Amino acid sequence: MTCRKQTILMCGLIGILSAGTSAAWAIDVKLSSEDAHKALETGRLPMEKANSPEDVKKVLQQASLATRVGADPETDPCGASAVLRTKRYRLEAFGRQEAAESKKRNTEIRMPEEFIKKVMDMPNMEIEVQLCGDDEYFAEGALIELQQGSKRIKAIDIGKAERGRKNETNGPAYRSRFTALFAYEQFDPNAASVFVVNLQDGKEIRVPAEFSKVK
């Protein structure tokens, strides 16, 4: 085999592997029953090993970081961020609940299949946006859309923002959060994206979201 042919072959293999990696880490819109039960196990096992309230806290913090986009609350507590409650996120949460209830009742507890199927069939992804502002009601009436290149995707529903809580760290005086729903069929689960929040005072807040790194 010539050097040129070897180079072409290697490039082809790298391209295939890269494409496979991207697809594996994109937001999963469709899950098989096997995938769903693996997600339950992924959530269940760390909680089974958690033997103290501090261990449980660490498990829950790690779970929220896995699908969080935008600012890292550990290093930037008042930076805007969003937790993407994907299908895998919800199933892993079910798994943690299974482990917690099993310990509490001292018997094995498992989620009914109809609950699991309901998550698998969910048409929308819920996100929870967390941000800071200058007064208690700064997030009231906030609007949000998802931008992917030139495409603009509107939220199909936006929850009422929480009344701001006093911010004990540096930055704006209050922190708040709200939820929004986006239809899976309307966005690309692999694309680099930005959630754009528009507040009633005219301020725009952008939360970058690399979907290819979220399950």
Where are these regions (language model features)?
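Bacterial N-terminal signal peptides that target proteins for export
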Residues: 2-11
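Conserved, well-structured beta-alpha core segment at the onset of a catalytic domain
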Residues: 2-3, 19-26
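Bacterial N-terminal signal peptides
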Residues: 10-20
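Conserved functional micro-motifs across diverse proteins
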Residues: 25-193, 197-215
